[in-house]
């Protein structure tokens, strides 16, 4: 039950972080898509972990089962840590792509603005 509450709290935290990041940047549409993709990945990973955790509820409450439960939780924590690290790396790569795309987008916007001025004036 504790692992379920912890995993649910993580899902909510990642969703909140994802939402707050898109509100403070200039790349709203593109970043919203990427944040949404990351949030979906986090949610899927956590739901998978929750499914595994719910399977553990069938274990009896003996010392041996408690040890198995603890081993399983440690394994789940390591898997989640690896998934989060991978997602952070992907997020950093997306950030680099955005840095590369931003000057091009600004230049294109300037060109379009200039064309509109020429047509109107």
Swiss-Prot record:
Lineage: Eukaryota, Metazoa, Ecdysozoa, Arthropoda, Chelicerata
The protein, known as: Met-lysine-1a
Keywords annotated in UniProt: Amidation, Secreted, Signal
Localization: Secreted
Main location per the UniProt record: secreted
Functional summary from the UniProt entry: Shows no antimicrobial activity against Gram-positive bacterium B.subtilis B-501 or Gram-negative bacterium E.coli DH5-alpha at concentrations up to 20 ug/ml. Shows no toxicity towards insect (S.carnaria) larvae.
Gene Ontology cellular component list: extracellular region
Pfam families, per the entry: Latarcin
Residues with the Methionine amide modification: 120
């Amino acid at each position: 039950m504790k692992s379920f509450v912890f995993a649910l709290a993580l899902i909510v935290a990642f969703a909140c972080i994802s939402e707050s990041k898109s509100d403070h940047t200039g790349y709203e549409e593109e970043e919203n898509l990427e944040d949404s993709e990351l949030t979906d990945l986090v949610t899927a990973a956590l739901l998978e972990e929750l499914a595994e955790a719910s399977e553990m509820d069938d274990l009896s409450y003996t010392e041996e089962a408690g040890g198995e439960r603890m081993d399983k939780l440690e394994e789940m924590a390591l898997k989640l840590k690896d998934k989060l690290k991978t997602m952070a790396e992907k997020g950093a790569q997306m950030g680099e792509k955005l840095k590369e795309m931003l000057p091009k987008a600004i230049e294109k916007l300037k060109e379009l603005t200039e064309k509109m001025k020429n047509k109107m004036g």
